[in-house]
Design a protein with these regions (language model features):
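Short-chain dehydrogenase/reductase
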Residues: 1-66, 154
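A short C-terminal helix-loop "cap" of Rossmann-like NAD(P)-dependent dehydrogenase/epimerase domains
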Residues: 9-13, 155-169
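Structural signature of beta-strand start/N-cap positions in the alpha/beta core
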Residues: 40, 95, 138-140
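Catalytic loop of short-chain dehydrogenase/reductase
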Residues: 49-88, 95-134, 146-148, 167
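Short, flexible catalytic-loop segment of classical short-chain dehydrogenase/reductase
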Residues: 139, 143-154
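A conserved structural motif in NAD(P)-dependent oxidoreductases
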Residues: 169-180
Length: 180
């Protein structure tokens, strides 16, 4: 709430609804509120990821079953759960956008289970795009590079990843939240 409410105020919006993506009832309640308020939906930006930050240290091989399941649920399956409900409000088509990272394609130090989750997310995007394209709903993922976010703060040596990106990206700098 401490981050979302100021953002809503900055956008002159009084609508701030809770949505726990690990709970189907919470997701249903969220979309019911959207339906009552607007009746339809044009787009969704899925910018959700989570993993136990202690398991982003060391090696992927040490990932616990509990964290694997929770990370996949929050970071990947949540997109599918949101698409299931959003499509009902996108009667004239729409756009669903999620965020990925190069760690989905290649090994990145300390990214561990998040790399697996982002790989699964990217594959989910392809299948969701196939299913929902018939309903004129586009589903895409963007991978803008490492960005300083709350989720990124849990990754060990994230500063190193940012610096590496600054030296190796075509822009010779990291992408900002505002650019995305």
């Amino acid at each position: 709430k401490k981050r979302v409410i100021p953002l809503a105020e900055k956008c002159n919006s009084s609508m701030v609804y809770e949505c726990d993506v690990t709970n189907d009832e919470s997701i249903d309640n969220f979309f019911n509120k959207i339906s009552k308020e607007w009746g339809s939906l044009d787009f969704i930006v899925h910018s959700i990821a989570f993993s136990d930050k202690n398991e982003l240290k060391g090696g992927y091989v040490d990932t616990s079953r509990e964290n694997f399941i929770n990370t996949m649920n929050v970071s990947c399956y949540s997109l599918t759960a949101l698409c299931q409900r959003a499509r009902l409000l996108m009667k004239n088509g729409g756009q669903i956008l999620t965020l990925s990272y190069v760690g989905a394609e290649r090994v990145m130090p300390h990214y561990n289970i998040m790399g697996i989750a982002k790989s699964a997310l990217e594959t989910s995007v392809k299948y969701l795009a196939e299913d929902l394209g018939k309903e004129n709903i586009r589903v895409n993922a963007i991978s803008a590079g490492p960005i300083k976010t709350l989720a990124a703060s849990g990754i060990s040596d994230f500063r190193y990843i940012l610096k590496w990106n600054e030296y190796n990206s075509p822009l010779r700098r990291s992408t900002s939240i505002e650019e995305v």
